[in-house]
Amino acid sequence: MCFVVALLSVTISAKAYDYVTFDNDPAQARRYTLANGLTVYMSRNAEKPEIQTMIAVRAGGQNDPLNSTGLAHYLEHLMFKGTHTYGTTDYEKEKPLLKQIDDLYELYGQTTDPEKRAAIYHQIDSVSYLNSKIAVANEFDKLMSMIGATGVNAYTSDDRTCYHEVIPAGELRRWAIIESDRFQNMVIRGFHTELEAVYEEFNMYSTMDRDKVMLAVNNILYPNVPYRQHSIIGTQEHLKNPSIKNIRRFYDNYYRPNNVVICLSGDLDFDKTIAIIDEYFGQWQPNPTIENYETPYQAPLTQHRDTVVYGKESPEVWMGWRMPDITHKDMDAIEVMESVLQNGKCGLLDVDIDQRQRMLSVGAGALAGKDFTTFFMIGAPKEGQSLEEVRKMLLEEIEKLKRGEFSERMLQAINANERRNEMQSLQSNRSRANKFLHSFIYKIPYEDVIGELDRKAAITKEDIMRVANRYFTDSYACVFKQQGEGVNPPKVDKPKITPIDMNREAQSQRVKELSAMSADQLQPQYLHFDRDLSRSTLNNGQELLYVQNKENELFELDFCIEKGTHQDPSLSLATDLLSYLGTATMTTEMFKSDLYQIAAEAGAYASANETHFYIYGLQENFQKTLQLLEEWVLTARPEETVYQEVVADRIKAHEDSKLDQRSCFGNLRSYGTYGKKNFRRMVLTPKQMKKLSGEKVLTRLRELIPGMCRVTYYGPMREGELKQVLNTQSKLVAQGSRDAQIHSERIQPEVVKKSEVYIAPFDANTTYYVGYANWGEVYTPKDEAIIRLYNEYFDGSMGSIVFQEMREARALCYTSAAYYSMAGHKGENNSYITYIITQNDKLKDCMLTFDSICNFMPMSQAAFEQAKSSLLKSIEKRRYVRSSPIGSYLGFRDKGWDHDLFEDIYREVKNLTLEDVQAFQKQHVANRTYRYFFLGNEKEMPMDFLKTRGSVRRLKIKDIFVY
C-alpha cells in the first residue's frame, strides 16, 4: 500500500509538494512527481555525508533509429561536453562553427567516394580545431571535481541511459545547477574526437567472443527486433557515418522530464532536496508526444535452431529460450526457477554438474527486458568433451527441473538467502537507487518492487514446474562457440586529426559563478585506532580485530595466514580442491546444502601472500556456520578421482586463458613487472600437480593453520562473548601457536635499469601497452600527500592531463592511464605506470604523446586548483563504516603508519602548490627508464620505432604462462 502526503517546506519554499510513501519499505523511500512530469525518488541514509545520484532517461539502444545504430550510447558520451553556459568561453561565437560541423557531417554521411570523404573530413578537422579555441574541454568534469563528486560516469543499455555520481551531502544545490543545465541545454561539441574514442571502444569489445555469441542467440530468437542485431555501440558502418542532427533529434525527443527519473539516496533532507530539484529542474519542458519503443511481432519458434560462431577464445555452448517481458506475472517464478537451477550451493547445476566435475564451468540465468526475457544456459567443455555432450547435459537438467526433481526445502532456502542479500543491499545507497531506477524504467509499481520477496516466498514447487514446462520447450537457440578464425570488423585506418586546443586556463562564466557559490563544508573524520576498532589477542596468540555491527544481524569472520601462492603455489590448488569436497560426515552436496539452508557462506582462498578461511551470514547462525567451516577445513578427505579432475580442469582452464586477450595481457604485465617469479606464474605445472595427491595438498594447507596470525570479526556479537567462543570452541584457533605464526617475505617488483621492449603475440585490431618504470625508490610516508596530488592532477579525472591529451585532444584511445604507483607495504619500491589500449596504427602516436606529457607536464593553475579541491573534498567526506575500520587499519599498518594517514595528507595538501607538483614530476617522473610491454600483432606495430626504445625481447605466450 502507498500513501500520498502533502508536504509544506516552510524554510525553503512556500510551495507544497505531494509525495508517496510505501508500506513495509525498508528504504523508507519517498516518490515525488513535479508538475512537468519529472519523477524523483529519495531515501535517507545518513551513514556517510554523501548522496548517490542517478538521473536516468527511459531510452537506450532499443530506441536507436534504424539508420543510426549506437546513437543512444554516443549521445551519452556527448552529454559530458557542456552546455550553452559551460564548456565554452563564448557560445554565440561557437554557434556558426558548430552549425558548419553539423552540415559537414551530414554531407560526409551521404558521400561514398573515399577521396571526397577524406576532403570533407579534413574540413571537419579544421573547423573543429577552430572551435576548440573557443570551447573549454571537460568543464563538466571540472565542475564535478569542484564539488567533490566521485564515480562520475554513465552507461547505456537497451532500455535506459543512466548518469550517476556520488556527491558530498552539502553540494546538492551546485550539483542540481550543473546537471539541470546539461539535461536542458546540452551542446554537441568535440564531436570528431569523441566519435573516434567510441570507435576505440568498439575495437576493444569486438575482440570479445561473448558479444558475438550473444548476437548469434538474438539473431535466432529475435530476428525482427532491430536493436538485438547489434551491440549497444552500434554497427561499424553507422559509427563511421554519424549524423549530429539525428543525435539532437533523439535528445529533443527522449531527454524530457516526463521520461526521466532522478534517484537520490544518502544523507539528505527530503524537504530541502525536493525544493532544490524543483527550483532547477522544474522549468524543464516536457514532451507530450514522446516516440516510445514498440516491440515488433516475433513469430514463435517451432523448433530449436543451431548455429556456430568462431573466435579466438575457448569453446562454449550457449542456449537461449525466449520468455516473457520483465513485467509478466510469471517473472517471479522464473527468477526463483533460476536459483533452483543454480545458486552456488545446491541448485541442480551445482550438484549434478559442478560438484561432480562434469563440465569445466556451467551457468544459467535470465536476462530480463522490456519486451522479452532471454533465459541462458551456458556450458564450457572439459578436455576431450564435445559441445554436443555439453548441450545434452544442460538439457538433462532442464528435464529434471520440469519433472520437479528438487525439494520444497530448497525453495525455503532460496528465500532465506534472498532476504540476507536484501539486508546487505540496503546498506548500499547505489542499491537503493537502482531499485528506484528499476521501478521507473520498467513501469513497475514501487510497491511491487519492495513486495518481491514476499511474492517469491509464496512460489511453490508446482509453480516452478509450470513455468519450466511452459517456457523450456524445444524452441530454443543453441550457439556452438568454436575456437577458430572468426569474422572480425574490417580494419579502418586512423583518421588524420589535428590535436585540438584544450584551453586549460580558460573558464566559462558559469564555472566562475559556481566557484564563487558557498557550500556546506564537511569536516574530515579520521580513523582512531583505539576507538573505532578493538585490537586484542586470543589465548593462543592470534591477533583479534573487532568491530561491532550495531545496524543489523549480519556478521563476517575471517582467519588469515600470511603465506600465499608466492611462497607455495600448491595452496591455490588446495583451496580449489576443497571447494569440491564435503566433510568426514557430510557429502559435498550435504555440506553446501546445510550452508544454503541457513543463508551462510563459508570458503577458503589463497592470494599472492595470504591464505584465508572465512564465513559470513546471520548472527543467529554464527556458531553453526563456524562449526561447518571448521569441520570442512579440518576433516575433508578427497577421493583421488576428484583431485585428478581438479588437476585436469586447471590444466584446461590454463590453456583456455591463453586465448583471452585480457588474460594474456595480465600475465605479460606481471611478467614484465616482477620477472619470471610473479604471482601469475606461481602455478604448478601439470607434471608437478600429477606428482602430488589430494591428500598431500590438503596436508600442506592444514600445516599452515598453527601459523595463523590474525582473526577479524564484524558483527552484532559483543567482543567478550566472541572471544569466549573463539577461545573455547574454535578448532582453528585452538591449533594456533604464538611460536608458529607465519610472516612470509613478499616478492618485490624488479628495478628497471635499462630500457627494454617486451612483445607477446595476440592477433587483434588493438594493442595493449604498458610502460613500467621502477628506479628503486622506496616508499616513505612523507611522500603520500604530493604523490596523491600529482596523480589527481595528472590523471585523476576526465578533466586531467592524461585524459585530455590522449583522448580529448588526439582521439588516440578509449582508455588510458598514467600514475605514480605507491607501494602497499613499508620498505617496498614505488613505480611509475603508463597504460593504454589503442588501435594498432595509433601505437606510435600514443607513446610519443606519453613521452611529451610525462617528461614535460602541461601546467595549468586552474586544473591544479580543481585537482586540489577534489582531493581535499574526497577526504572530507571519507567515513569509516561497517567493517571498513579493519581493512583501513591493516592498510595503514602495512605502510608503517601508526595513525590515519589521511590526517597528514589533508593537512599537507592544503599547503602544496603547482610548483611542488612540477618539482615532483621533474624529480620522480620525467625521463624515466621504461620497460615496455606490448600485447598485439607485431606485424602491425611500428617496429623500427620500438627498436629505438630499447632491446626487443619477443616472448611466447607460454613464456608468460609457465606452460
Residue locations for each model-derived region?
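Bacterial N-terminal signal peptides
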Residues: 1-11
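M16 family metallopeptidases and their MPP-like homologs
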Residues: 43, 48-61, 70-72, 88-181, ...
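A common structural junction motif
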Residues: 181-188, 280-288, 395-406, 631-640, ...
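Proteolytic maturation boundary segments
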Residues: 13-42, 269-309, 315-316, 351, ...
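Carboxylate/His-rich catalytic cores and anion/metal-binding grooves
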Residues: 199-211
